[in-house]
């Protein structure tokens, strides 16, 4: 039913999606997560098609600061304290910024260590960067931190792409059983943030 973290990280390293579940007492949601450096146009289209469509790109604070991407607001009133930064698009090779091609390109360039100039991105845009806590899931058990921790475990640039799964029949958020069924249908491994936390603790 649930994959081991080792199996999940291997898939993640190969550029495959994972479904990551948080605790039922938290958001009780499953996010599709993929490494930012790997995401293709086709995968971005899949992500948008089966999710809320509000694609976010978690990354380290160091990466955000190096690209001079500020936080969206000074006073964060989000219930889960999700750390939204100013939206953006990659400046070269995109048109409106909203297409699967453009969003995938922007995400890959955010993950590209050779892209170092803030001027390479236009703001506002259609990708929502998220600032992960430095301590990862051990500091905050959110999908933001899970995405960055998975990148680190896979030896990839610490930039992911995430979006919440929704049910096709009614558009409501996918819960545990929905996520398990979706993963089985599409061959996507499912893990929990709790198991990721335990795995990371075991490596310390």
Swiss-Prot record:
Q: Which residues carry this modification: S-glutathionyl cysteine?
A: 56
Q: Which InterPro entries match?
A: DHBP_synth_RibB-like_a/b_dom (IPR017945), DHBP_synthase_RibB (IPR000422)
User: Which residues of this UniProt protein bind Mg(2+) 1?
Assistant: 27
- What Pfam families does this protein's entry cite? DHBP_synthase
- Which GO terms of the molecular function aspect are on file? 3,4-dihydroxy-2-butanone-4-phosphate synthase activity; metal ion binding
Q: In which pathway does it act?
A: Cofactor biosynthesis; riboflavin biosynthesis; 2-hydroxy-3-oxobutyl phosphate from D-ribulose 5-phosphate: step 1/1
Give residues annotated as binding Mg(2+) 2: 27, 143
Give the record's GO CC terms: cytosol; mitochondrial intermembrane space; nucleus
Q: Which UniProt keywords apply?
A: Glutathionylation, Lyase, Magnesium, Manganese, Metal-binding, Riboflavin biosynthesis
Q: How is it modified after translation?
A: S-glutathionylation is reversible and dependent on a glutaredoxin.
Marked site, Essential for catalytic activity, at 126, 164
Q: Kindly list the positions annotated as binding D-ribulose 5-phosphate.
A: 31, 82, 140-144
Gene Ontology biological-process annotations? riboflavin biosynthetic process
Q: What is its EC number?
A: 4.1.99.12
Q: Briefly state the protein's biological role.
A: Catalyzes the conversion of D-ribulose 5-phosphate to formate and 3,4-dihydroxy-2-butanone 4-phosphate.
Q: Which family does it belong to?
A: Belongs to the DHBP synthase family.
* Assembly, per entry: Homodimer.
Q: What is this protein called?
A: 3,4-dihydroxy-2-butanone 4-phosphate synthase
Native organism: Schizosaccharomyces pombe (strain 972 / ATCC 24843) (Fission yeast)
